[in-house]
Regions:
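Active-site substrate-recognition segment that forms the wall
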Residues: 77, 117-125, 211-213, 228-363, ...
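C-terminal catalytic lobe of FAD-dependent flavoproteins
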Residues: 314-430
Length: 455
């Protein structure tokens, strides 16, 4: 892959974000103490924490830092998981689960701390994250989350319907869960800022250098690319959602453990000040409890950055614009005519039980999967934990225990069928207003069964 082959999506983030550091291709034979495959948030965070400990580290990136999921997402900084709550995590992992919950609790604060300490210009706004509930039955989700996260000292609050209306500027929701430490960033600016930071600290990033294979030679791992190779005493594979694109032949057990789900993002024209002040006036990040998720946040230019899902062939962009326009006008009639300046997509890495996983891939070799839509906050402390593992910290002290990869059965078929789950989600969303309790029970039964299958 050469520099001309790196094509960025037509995204808002690619349009407004300054270029990252100049990263050469990997050529010849190189060495480092630690080699990381993947230049997204996790790989960059791992490199950052290793360089803080003066470890010689090099990243091998297939395209450019932030090209994959890290630079394409909505940029919401969410210090929770998508489904499992603290009690679920502790029931699964015991004492390690308590450490993991503490890591999650602090994950958003950790991200904003890194941004401040290294003066990364990521358009960051720590105004909090709110999860409004879309049906009366779903208020139980917010109540449960507030109760469980409060036990661990998280700054969370249960919002009434009136409080939610005041916070979001819409009466479409029935209450909500609010975490004050959340917020949002320009994710590509964060990725490029992290890349610039780690290079400044002495790390090397080899771009446009897809890893073709790795093997154990003596006491070192050797990663081969088209034009060169690099060896290290330790190896970290941090490809996650794009494992199937760039690392399927490298670590098939990881590539088939994570399900890449296509996520569409959209950015409106900048809203006028008068309208902006009536729609999410406090500029919180918002994503609700719909199966077909409703989510939105502002960028630094007052564009409303949202998205949706679309099925089938044909003009997907046109149909998506029409569907999301109708949604925005229904939620916020005051928005008036809606025009989208940018529409793009990228993959989210999903595991069957909605939990992230760390793996040992061999002596001094590590990998992970499963951002499950929470990568922006999660990957910063996760990179720290991978760096600690590389440096020999015992597993009993890590925030996330190691586990064996658990593949999706019939992964290729499921990948084709997964988008059509949207039909089921839409049907449930429409029926929940009448039969909320029934569908709430079904949702958690599904989670329980997925957890049992992945053990």
């Amino acid at each position: 892959m050469n520099s001309n082959a790196v094509r960025w999506p037509n995204s808002l983030w690619a349009a407004v974000t300054p270029s990252g550091p100049d990263c050469p291709e990997l050529t010849g034979a190189q060495q480092a103490d630690v080699v990381i495959i993947g230049g997204g948030f996790t790989g960059l965070s791992t490199a950052l924490h290793l360089r803080e400990a003066s470890v010689d580290v090099a990243i091998v990136e297939a395209a450019e830092p932030g090209w994959g999921a890290s630079g394409r997402n909505n940029g919401q900084v969410i210090p929770t998981l998508s489904r499992p709550d603290p009690d679920d995590i502790i029931a699964r992992h015991g004492a390690a689960g308590e450490r993991f919950v503490a890591m999650l609790r602090d994950s958003a604060a950790d991200l904003f701390d890194v941004v401040r300490r290294y003066n990364i210009a990521a358009e960051q706004e720590q105004a909090g994250w709110v999860q409004p509930v879309h049906s009366p039955g779903r208020i139980r989700i917010a109540e449960r989350r507030v109760q469980q996260w409060s036990k661990f000292g998280a700054p969370v609050e249960l919002l009434s319907r009136d409080q939610t209306k005041d916070m979001l500027g819409s009466d479409a929701w029935y209450g909500g869960f609010w975490n004050r430490t959340g917020g949002h960033v320009n994710p590509l600016a964060l990725a490029r800022g992290l890349a610039r930071t780690v290079v400044g600290l002495g790390a090397r990033i080899y771009a446009r250098s897809p890893a073709l294979s790795f093997e154990r030679r003596g006491d070192r791992w050797v990663v081969k690319t088209e034009k060169g190779e690099i060896s290290g005493r330790s190896l970290v594979v941090a490809t996650n959602a794009y494992s199937g694109e760039f690392a399927k032949s490298l670590v098939p057990e990881i590539a088939t453990e994570v399900m890449p789900v296509l996520s569409w993002q959209m950015a409106t024209q900048p809203l006028s000040d008068n309208v902006r002040k009536t729609i999410i006036p406090g500029r919180q990040a918002m994503s609700d409890t719909h199966g077909e998720l409703y989510f939105a946040r502002y960028d630094a230019r007052n564009r409303l950055v949202t998205g949706g899902a679309v099925l089938g062939p044909g003009d997907k962009t046109g149909r998506l614009k029409a569907r999301v326009t109708e949604r925005l006008q229904r939620l916020w009639p005051q928005i008036g005519e809606v025009s989208f300046d940018y529409v793009w997509n990228g993959y989210v890495g999903m595991t069957a039980d909605f939990l992230p996983r760390m793996h040992r891939l061999g002596p001094n070799a590590y990998g992970w999967t499963g951002c499950n839509g929470r990568a922006v906050a999660l990957t910063i402390p996760l990179g720290r934990e991978l760096a600690r593992a590389v440096q020999g910290v015992p597993e009993s002290e890590l925030a996330l225990p190691f586990s064996e990869p658990v593949q999706y059965m019939a992964h290729g078929l499921l990948r084709k069928l997964a988008p059509w789950m949207l039909v089921l989600y839409r049907r449930r969303d429409a029926q929940e207003l009448v039969k909320g309790d029934r569908f709430e029970l079904l949702r958690w039964a599904e989670y329980f069964l997925a957890s049992r299958r992945s053990r």
